């Protein structure tokens, strides 16, 4: 006479539904699943769907109070990964109702929150997400986007040039400002705070903001071009971050920056809204990304983090370089670069794009090529990244034999 039978039951009975037709409003995910030996792929795929939506390990009486069919994630397709033994791509569909509108934080909590520690899996990697139009529309997205940025800066038909001020830690604010001035005066469009420059004892944020702004306006007057310096507003609390953003706006600078993974999506979205309301461009650095995306069997691919950023909001984002690496990586990098910029992306597995994604006019993000690049890489970079990009040379500019300004000139000349 018991109402239901308790006990551990197989996930695939409920959560593996190969006959399911995906809806336009579903969020779709592609997971690379490596099951433990002896666990069938359907069970592993279903376990992922369950654990990241409504499931728990047993039947509970409260299940009877909701409509599982309406709210459960479903594993609707599984395919083996060619060339890998016992590894599969599991496709999972999540009903839209499982997610809070306009919250990238909640989306990631739901999809990747728990399931990665799951015992039945040796490893799990989220390869791609398809964000439905209905969900995209609940996000503001990037504060301005590519076209508005070009209009603000009055720079057209070429990539933008930047450089990170080195040595990244240890300069006083005044010398830091001097380095900024030299680079901008020499012909770069932007200079950048390093991602770990926040507000340390040797240079407090306010002093840095003031000296960099002075350098920026001086270079602007002398060159007749609009210049920018990414003032890093990342801080220990959201309130402190906003205080820095407000101060930047009062100084009248064009752009600030944020480390969106260490700072968190919640802080980032708040900042992006502020930037749109106050006409600031927002440059995004991806510090910590390799912790999440480096392993090919476990974690999340960077294209997922990039999609999350476009929803949360940012006008530039770092996207690696591709120069001098393998050909295959090049296609994949190009895949997520286009994913950031274009309004519509076709499914293309060779470029790592598992789903067709329609961004319905959400503004685009400019990819930033940075990390170990210098003048000689320019032709390759422009070929790969095209015009809508920021090419960021760090040590490769400042370490040039005659100092920053000539090297900045060299970068500008090489570009043209």
From Swiss-Prot:
Q: What GO molecular function annotations does the UniProt record carry, in alphabetical order? A: magnesium ion binding; monooxygenase activity; ribulose-bisphosphate carboxylase activity
Per the similarity annotation, which family is this? Belongs to the RuBisCO large chain family. Type I subfamily.
* Residues at the active site: 166 (proton acceptor), 285 (proton acceptor)
Which co-factor is required? Mg(2+)
Encoding gene per record: rbcL
Please outline how this chain is modified post-translation: The disulfide bond which can form in the large chain dimeric partners within the hexadecamer appears to be associated with oxidative stress and protein turnover.
Enzyme nomenclature, EC number = 4.1.1.39
> What Gene3D superfamilies does the database record attribute to this sequence?
Ribulose bisphosphate carboxylase, large subunit, C-terminal domain, RuBisCO large subunit, N-terminal domain
Q: Subunit details for this protein?
A: Heterohexadecamer of 8 large chains and 8 small chains; disulfide-linked. The disulfide link is formed within the large subunit homodimers.
Residue numbers of N6,N6,N6-trimethyllysine PTMs: 5
Residues binding substrate are 114, 164, 168, 286, 318, 370
Stated name of the protein: Ribulose bisphosphate carboxylase large chain
Q: Where is this site: Transition state stabilizer?
A: 325
